[in-house]
Design a protein with these regions (language model features):
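Cleavable N-terminal export/targeting peptides
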Residues: 1-25
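Short N-terminal segments immediately surrounding and downstream of signal-peptide cleavage
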Residues: 20-36
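Outer-membrane beta-barrel channels and translocator barrels
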Residues: 21-23, 72-76, 112-114, 162-164, ...
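Residues on the lipid-exposed face of transmembrane beta-strands in outer-membrane beta-barrel proteins
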Residues: 30, 34, 62-71, 105-109, ...
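Short beta-strand segments enriched in hydrophobic/aromatic residues
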Residues: 34, 71-73, 82-84, 111, ...
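Surface-exposed coil loops of outer-membrane beta-barrel proteins
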Residues: 35-59, 88-104, 112-193, 199-203
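Outer-membrane beta-barrel pore domains
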Residues: 50-55, 88-98, 196-199, 207-333
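Glycine- and aromatic-enriched membrane insertion/assembly motifs of diderm outer-membrane
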Residues: 55-86
């Protein structure tokens, strides 16, 4: 009887240990966000927006909700990031395999402690900002982010050349072709990381709605314990036309719970397809207040264009500027 009891106890111990191991390997995370937005220089029923990705509604609106399922084995793993809501539909162009619900879905293999292969769809390596608002300081998005890729479908290899230097090489479908490519064309991506600064290159043919060539620098510096300066700059060319821009992200932490930051961005168009070579100065001031897993972000944004009048003021007259106040709430789990 004692032997039987010991055997059962041993099996139960193994089961509990295996269960604990599985719980550590499998994780669920995600976020939910919503916002309120009102224009300061125009009527809320004017039907206009800044012209950047996401958060383009007035009044109360849903951003997105996403759930990330991750399984990490000893050397292999998989990630599925499911998303819904207007921000999710915009990020996947609502033309996904399952009607815009798959943000990311990929498998990976840690070939060694210095080499990782990733196969599937993954969010872009270009730019300072990302799709999920929980990972951005500003709630609204920049022009640089809005005009670059959101995601890539393909194969990439990440190499840790040292503790502070990395290299990524990628072969993908053309710009934001998230599921099936009907053109038979491919894009190439390269990222060189150097002490927290990243030089990114992307190129496709530019035809069939492709992006063409883009070079991007993304980085930042901790100037003091409480002051961080983020930097993003990019140049795009597609058959002689494209965009350019630069953005600074100074952010100051005033306490453990509150930070304030500015995004100052200059963005412009160039080339034969843009004869007026319009440009915009976009200033966004954002506060960030943290309550446990909830982030509350009040934000004021002003965009002012040169050689373009894309907005309508409160009198219904075309104008070159638009300002808005936004209050967003983001919960992460």
């Amino acid at each position: 009887m004692k032997k039987l009891f010991k055997a059962v106890a041993f099996l139960l111990t193994i089961g509990v240990f295996a269960q604990e191991t599985e719980e550590k390997a499998f994780t669920i995370s995600g976020s939910v966000d919503a916002y309120f937005q009102t224009y300061l220089t125009a009527s809320d029923d004017s039907g206009q927006a800044f012209g950047t990705a996401f958060a383009d509604q007035t009044g109360f609106a849903l951003g997105m909700a996403n759930v990330i399922f991750s399984y990490e084995g000893e050397s292999v793993g998989a990630v599925v990031d499911l998303v819904t809501g207007p921000r999710g539909a915009g990020a996947t162009f609502n033309t996904d395999i399952v009607d815009g619900i798959v943000n990311q879905a990929y498998v990976y293999w840690n070939v060694s402690d210095k080499t990782t292969l990733t196969f599937g769809r993954w969010n872009t390596f270009l730019g300072y900002e990302v799709i999920a608002p929980a990972s951005n300081f500003n709630y609204s998005c920049s022009y640089l982010f809005s005009n670059g890729p959101f995601s890539h479908m393909g194969l990439k290899a990440d190499f840790a050349l040292s503790d502070d230097i990395s290299l990524m090489l990628a072969v993908t479908h053309p710009w934001d072709t998230n599921d099936i490519s009907a053109t038979g064309e491919y894009g190439l991506g390269v990222q060189l990381g150097f002490y927290g600064q990243y030089l990114n290159l992307y190129n496709d043919s530019g035809s069939n709605g492709g992006l063409g060539f883009e070079i991007d620098y993304t980085g930042g510096f901790d100037l003091t314990d409480s002051f961080f300066l983020g930097i993003n700059a990019a140049y795009n060319d597609n058959d002689g036309s494209g965009f350019y821009g630069a953005a600074l992200y100074p952010q100051i932490s005033t306490s453990d719970d509150f930070s304030i930051g500015l995004r100052g961005e200059l963005f412009g168009l160039h080339g034969d397809a843009n004869p007026n070579e319009e440009s915009v100065l976009a200033l966004t001031l954002t506060g960030s207040y943290v309550v446990e897993d909830l982030i509350i972000k009040p934000e004021i944004r002003l965009d002012s264009w040169t050689d373009a009048t894309p907005y309508i003021d409160s009198d219904g007259v075309a104008t070159d500027n638009l300002a808005a106040f936004t209050l967003a709430a983001i919960y992460s789990f």
